[in-house]
Amino acid sequence: MSHRKFSAPRHGSLGFLPRKRSSRHRGKVKSFPKDDPSKPVHLTAFLGYKAGMTHIVREVDRPGSKVNKKEVVEAVTIVETPPMVVVGIVGYVETPRGLRTFKTVFAEHISDECKRRFYKNWHKSKKKAFTKYCKKWQDDAGKRQLDKDFSSMKKYCQVIRVLAHTQMRLLPLRQKKAHLMEIQVNGGTVAEKLDWARERLEQQVPVSQVFGQDEMIDVIGVTKGKGYKGVTSRWHTKKLPRKTHRGLRKVACIGAWHPARVAFSVARAGQKGYHHRTEINKKIYKIGQGYLIKDGKLIKNNASTDYDLSDKSINPLGGFVHYGEVTNDFVMLKGCVVGTKKRVLTLRKSLLVQTKRRALEKIDLKFIDTTSKFGHGRFQTVEEKKAFMGPLKKDRIAKEEGA
């Protein structure tokens, strides 16, 4: 900032340095919520996949506010959350230098989509992962060893986490390799946590057992990648005057002569996006149920409300752009979340005790928009579109060919 007439704050935060590509694709939970033994045993996190955005209409319940009892339109994000499968239990002991892994126990049967996570190239591999380990569950000596492991975990461990993976075959994605993560089990005693986890080995855990309606959660993920960007785009520094020699989307002064180095705090060109970020306080507007078969019929009606009784699913006409159809359970979050469509997101219970009125507000949805997100959508359902458009030429041609 040499020879400037007025002082000015620096551009861009130094709190997110180094701005480089994230080493991991899946958002990492760096701290779980504090354990409270008085609460029932529960999981503290879940994995989901970003499908896309839409908007909703709801009535605000905020007495004293100007918008109280008025309708508001708000943007929401749909995150598809198929049930996760528990495949292991990890026990931790507390040491003066933090937590240390004490024992890890895997389930007897582990699906191929989970085993793929342990291989670089599944196609060329012998696919032998866990073949020796699973025999522990079958012979007497192995069973005795497992019982011994569980009893020692009950005796020595302070923290219990479960290993759970997503079910990629239920999603409209090409990826076959499941995402695997450790999820901390909170509530109850250590013995109760272990019994809870042992009962759920190889079982599916739905998102409705982890989060509740109107809950505030945190979303952890990796942002959209933008590639190598110049200093103006990356740090939002001021453009130089038009007549500037050798370019104007630059930083004019990158430091003093001495020290004869460029300081780390000076804005420079480089990687933008694909950074690991944690966004706190995202409100759950709805936990929706996936498609289900009832009395031999496929029920898709998961976007109706008490005010909008039309039979429609959460999917917009033509599906979510660059994603497809959401057929499993989903979580509707207020506002936007990090990452591109199809990006895996880690949903975590809030670390804070929520006391604000906005956080505790009850959400009553009046309407969920399901118009096409590709262009200017006009119709909420296929039936509505057919009724408006009338018989189409392509329908007549198809009918003639069929006849």
Swiss-Prot record:
Residue spans of biased composition, Basic residues class: 18-31
GO biological process, one term: translation
UniProt-annotated location(s): Nucleus, Nucleolus; Cytoplasm
PROSITE patterns: RIBOSOMAL_L3
Sites bearing N6-acetyllysine, chain numbering: 136, 286, 294, 366, 373
Cross-link for Glycyl lysine isopeptide (Lys-Gly) (interchain with G-Cter in SUMO1), residue positions: 294
Superkingdom of this protein's organism: Eukaryota
GO cellular component: cytosolic large ribosomal subunit; nucleolus
Cross-link named Glycyl lysine isopeptide (Lys-Gly) (interchain with G-Cter in SUMO2), sites: 39, 224, 226, 286, 366, 386, 393, 399
A molecular function GO annotation: RNA binding
SUPFAM superfamilies membership: Translation proteins (SSF50447)
Modified-residue entries (Phosphoserine), positions: 13, 304
List of residues that carry Tele-methylhistidine: 245
The record's account of how the chain is modified after translation: Constitutively monomethylated at His-245 by METTL18. Methylation at His-245 regulates translation elongation by slowing ribosome traversal on tyrosine codons: slower elongation provides enough time for proper folding of synthesized proteins and prevents cellular aggregation of tyrosine-rich proteins. It is not required for incorporation of RPL3 into ribosomes.
Location of region: Disordered: 1-37
Keyword Isomerase: no
Alphabetically ordered keywords of this record: Acetylation, Cytoplasm, Isopeptide bond, Methylation, Nucleus, Phosphoprotein, Ribonucleoprotein, Ribosomal protein, Ubl conjugation
Function: Component of the large ribosomal subunit. The ribosome is a large ribonucleoprotein complex responsible for the synthesis of proteins in the cell.
Assembly information from the UniProt record: Component of the large ribosomal subunit. Interacts with DHX33.
Similarity remark: Belongs to the universal ribosomal protein uL3 family.
The name this protein goes by in its record: Large ribosomal subunit protein uL3
Species for this entry: Oryctolagus cuniculus
